[in-house]
UniProtKB/Swiss-Prot annotation:
Family membership: Belongs to the inositol monophosphatase superfamily.
Topology versus the membrane: Single-pass membrane protein
Membrane-spanning ranges: 16-36
CC cofactor: Mg(2+)
Gene Ontology BP, a term: phosphate-containing compound metabolic process
Residues at which Mg(2+) 1 binds: 127, 167, 169
Listed pathway(s): Polyol metabolism; myo-inositol biosynthesis; myo-inositol from D-glucose 6-phosphate: step 2/2
Name of this protein: Putative inositol monophosphatase 3
Residues the entry annotates as binding Mg(2+) 2: 167, 170, 292
Protein's organism: Drosophila pseudoobscura pseudoobscura
Amino acid sequence: MSSSKMNGRSIRINRVPATIFAILLTIVLVYFLNFHQEERPAIYGKLRSDNPNRVNLRKMLIAAIQASQRGGLEVLDVARSRQLKVRSKGQTDEGVNDPFTDADGRSHCVMKQGLQRIFPRVRIFSEEDKEHCKESHSYDLDPTVLHETAQVPDVSVNAQDVTVWVDPLDATKEFTEELYEYVTTMVCVAVAGRPVIGVIHSPFNGQTAWAWVGNSMSEYLAGLHPPHGQENELPIITVSRSHTAGAKDLARGIFGEQVNLLTAAGAGYKVLQVVANNATAYLHTSKIKKWDICAGDAILHALGGTMTTLNDQLIRYGPDESPVNTEGLLATLEKHDKYMDQLVKYRTAHNGQLA
């Protein structure tokens, strides 16, 4: 006990409650600090694994979703500024101009640098790898990008088995034409050459479709209804609006002149049309880059669908594989074997040719 005098009166201060309060405050602080030391890495993940030779796929899924969404914000920002600074990378094999904009470059820098900082030993391929990034970009992992009911386990694999494919802006030509519905940003994670995680983000409607094969998927994909077409119903084939001649002719040759054709842009968008049952198949007859198709391949696989070359071969996405698929592709949610059989019959009838 201690005492002091004020206005001639003696005041006694009881130190016991103050001591108890100090002890309780210390306990709370210790608990808080321990929680953040032990639990935060489990939730948010250390930026780099304790074992740099291993990669946690749960963290990679979170990072892939964030990367695609952050890239999408860059695309939106450039679109709103109306300062696209369009230049040409040349022409495609079909003679179509292949444009490049500031949105492609800015999205690339945000997406690839962010992923590479978190996973420094993983091989990451981006469509715009030649682009020089003037600024350094990074972000912390945020698990809130996953919906609450997502069943996402902690699974680790060897870093050397992982390859990431990034498309910073799919459908650039349509982006310059303000056909924004076709525009997507995409990330795909392949393990041992096969796609296991796919993310397709649509910046202009805010929808992010993601799937981890055998584990979980976004609420949007989980809420889709399975196909319910009749057996004899004509299929709806989605083909590219930029180079449609070969695909249209092949579709008519296989399924008849009355086949329904849905022209669209962007490989990511066309896969989303298949998974949403707006198209029964996505047909592409010329070469296509793997960052355009890897995410869609993973999502289709997670939903029970299939993507193959026109020679009915699964597509490989390993680090030593060519970044270009030269054998065309057929992507379906169901009846893949049936459509492939019809394609083989057409090829046989035309001396092995598809056009």
